A protein has these predicted regions:
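Structural signal for interior beta-strand "rungs" in well-ordered beta-sheet cores
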Residues: 1-168
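Terminal amphipathic alpha-helical/low-complexity segments used for targeting or macromolecular assembly
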Residues: 31, 37, 42-58, 64, ...
């Protein structure tokens, strides 16, 4: 340990841990367990930090987290008052996982061995990344998303979905929704919305409008609509046949939608 490191009550460091609070402060919440050879708080993989002595807003880790061997969590790329790299509560980072600078990781997130999240990305609550899954920088991954092993995304993934190919949504995470206690009626409405609006290319404005209308009677559908409306990178498309050969760039009119943006 070096520099400004604050450990909450009951934190366990199991030996050969490397925690650097000299680049920026590191705060680790109560009852978190850090396994051997995990590295936390070192400078980001950014050329501007090489030999310059720049300071960072650091790292904040929540309570009851498990950080396994060789996991890495890098400090933010900007100093305070910019936010630190942030890990929520009850996050499980398995062996050799990576959280890059300026990421915001929600609660109850799981990264399986070898998964990596690039800088400035956001993972909302209850996201699971399979082994060796990778997230491009600045991406947003919605609540209760599950990514299969060896997948990669460079576009945003709406809440409640499953990713089973590169930048492709295979369907809803129905098993996760049931385990999370979502009522059957809401799951049914989500499935209808996904089937009707996300499987094939459709104008972004129409998707948001129709999904918002359906969301009046189903909050999870409304949550998905808000996520899509806020997207700046574009949305991973579904597995509909109409997607073959299509380009997923967002235009000015359809910014934030990985679908056709013209009527």
């Amino acid at each position: 340990l070096k520099g400004k490191v604050k450990l909450g009550a009951g934190v366990k460091l199991l030996g050969n841990n490397y925690i650097a609070g000299d680049v920026g402060p590191v705060v680790i919440g109560a009852r978190t367990i850090v396994y051997p050879f995990a590295c936390i708080g070192y400078e980001p993989q950014d050329f501007k930090f090489i030999g310059t002595g720049l300071k960072s807003a650091g790292v904040v880790i929540g309570t009851d987290c498990l950080i396994r061997e060789h996991a890495t969590i890098h400090a933010a790329s900007h100093d305070a008052p910019s936010p630190p790299t942030t890990i929520g509560n009850k996050v499980f980072l398995m062996v050799s996982t990576h959280i890059a600078h300026d990421c915001l990781i929600g609660n109850n997130v799981v990264l399986v061995n070898g998964a990596g999240v690039a800088g400035h990305s956001v993972l909302e609550d209850n996201v699971t990344l399979g082994g060796n899954a990778v997230i491009h920088q600045f991406c947003r991954i919605g609540r209760m998303v599950m990514m299969s092993g060896d997948c990669a995304v460079s576009l945003d993934v709406p809440p409640f979905c499953m990713v089973n190919e590169r930048n492709r949504i295979g369907g809803l995470n129905t098993v996760g929704l049931r385990r999370g206690g979502m009522p059957r009626e809401q799951i049914t409405e989500l499935r209808r919305a996904f089937r009707d609006l996300l499987r094939d290319p459709m104008p972004r404005a129409r998707v948001i409008s129709e999904m918002t209308e359906r969301g009046r009677s189903c909050e999870p559908v409304a949550e998905m609509a808000r996520f899509i409306a806020a997207s700046k990178r574009g949305i991973c498309p579904g597995m509909g046949k109409g997607l073959r050969g299509s380009r997923m760039n967002a235009s000015k009119d359809g910014e934030g939608m990985g679908m056709d943006s013209e009527d």
